[in-house]
């Protein structure tokens, strides 16, 4: 089905295209991907006749294929999900169907024992990529140890590894998979300071849309700042951190550490409040890299400084990628003399919601950067 004169869109369940088959109406599909919630999901709603399930039975694991093509914007994407939740409610003489699905990578929910390695944490992610023939990007780490999973699935274990990833006293690691099933394990400090492939967001109407994939127009913008302790990356600064010391065979408090993470806005070269509150899910036998405990505190601290969020509504879907570095034209402050000063701040695309219906294909984008707290008391 052609939408907006720009896109050829297909939504397939059991190889039946909901848009073109005529078996459903009021079809809406939203794809959610985020660097905080590492696994992409989608939600589909539509109305159809009561015999829809007789013809196309939907159960856990049913494949959902979403295709978006555009010659103008050089898009030829296919996203595959698997049903994890389904409901059908009577609505007059029709049924209202709701489907929630997760990215088609079941390996994330299996036991990850075959990925154990005595190497840097980045090699765990590289092994997952190679064994499952995935694309993506992995940043180098300096945290060699024996990485062995406990009773977790692969997704949980990757989150645990990322929380203890380390490369330097500036690093802040996180991982995610995007809707194209590409795997990423990134250092946010390295990403924002070394990236050269920068997307530029400009305010403008649809008819002003630039074909350049590095230029994206938006219609609405909301900017909000949250204190670090409320940031999604952070679980709070209070509490003490302890570890088990084999030499004395007792628990000891982990020393606070000074980090050299970079920020032009706030001072994060300070002690980490005697450690961040944390809990250990299993007994630690002493096999950990020398920065194992400090890494968890530093990762939380560095990531929590990214506490300014910008939400953009874009009327058209563009091939931007999660975690790309970008700039926006609305970043400025008003000085005391009334002059408006532009702030050339780099943002990271932290969330993308792709919305598809019979009349439009658009996206809502969330950007994040280090907080404005303390930068200026003037309006911005």
Task: Set out the residue ranges of the language-model regions.
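Short conserved beta-strand and strand-loop elements enriched in small hydrophobics
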Residues: 9-12, 62-71, 324-340
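An acidic/polar, Gly/Ser/Thr-rich interaction patch typically located in mid-to-C-terminal regions
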Residues: 31-57, 205-380
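Polar/acidic, low-complexity leader/linker segments enriched in S/T/G and N/D
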Residues: 1-27
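Flexible glycine-/small-residue-rich
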Residues: 46-48, 101-103, 187-189, 369
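Surface-exposed cap/loop segments at beta↔alpha junctions
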Residues: 52-139
């Amino acid at each position: 089905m052609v939408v907006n004169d720009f896109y050829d869109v297909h939504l397939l369940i059991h190889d039946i295209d909901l848009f073109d088959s005529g078996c459903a109406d009021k079809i809406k599909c939203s794809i959610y991907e985020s660097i905080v919630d590492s696994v992409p999901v989608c939600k589909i709603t539509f109305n159809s006749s009561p015999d829809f399930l007789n013809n196309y039975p939907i159960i856990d694991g049913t494949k959902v294929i979403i295709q978006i093509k555009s010659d103008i914007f050089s898009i030829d994407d296919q996203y595959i999900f698997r049903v994890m939740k389904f409901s059908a409610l009577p609505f007059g003489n029709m049924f209202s169907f709701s489907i929630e699905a997760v990215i088609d990578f079941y390996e994330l929910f299996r036991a990850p024992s075959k990925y154990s390695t005595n190497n840097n944490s980045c090699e765990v992610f590289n092994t997952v990529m190679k064994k499952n023939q995935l694309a993506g990007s992995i940043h180098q780490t300096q945290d060699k140890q024996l990485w062995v999973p406990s009773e977790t699935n692969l997704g949980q274990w990757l989150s645990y590894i990322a929380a203890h990833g380390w490369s330097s006293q500036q690093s802040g690691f996180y991982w995610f998979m995007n809707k194209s099933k590409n795997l990423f394990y990134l250092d946010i400090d390295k990403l924002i300071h070394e990236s050269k492939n920068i997307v530029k967001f400009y305010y403008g109407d649809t008819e002003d849309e630039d074909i350049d994939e590095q230029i994206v127009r938006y219609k609405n913008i909301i900017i909000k700042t949250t204190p670090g302790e409320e940031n999604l990356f952070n679980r709070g600064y209070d509490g003490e951190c302890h570890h088990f010391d084999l030499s004395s065979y007792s628990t000891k408090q982990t020393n606070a550490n000074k980090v050299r993470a970079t920020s032009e806005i706030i001072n994060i070269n300070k002690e980490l409040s005697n450690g961040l509150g944390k809990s250990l899910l299993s007994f630690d036998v002493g096999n950990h890299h020398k920065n194992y405990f400090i890494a968890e505190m530093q990762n939380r601290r560095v990531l929590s400084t990214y506490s300014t969020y910008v939400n953009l509504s874009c009327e058209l879907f563009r091939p931007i990628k999660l975690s790309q570095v970008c700039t926006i034209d609305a970043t400025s402050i008003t000085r005391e003399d009334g002059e408006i000063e532009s702030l050339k701040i780099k943002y990271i695309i932290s969330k993308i919601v792709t919305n598809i219906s019979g009349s439009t294909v658009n996206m809502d984008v969330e950007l994040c950067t280090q907080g404005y707290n303390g930068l200026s008391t003037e309006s911005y």
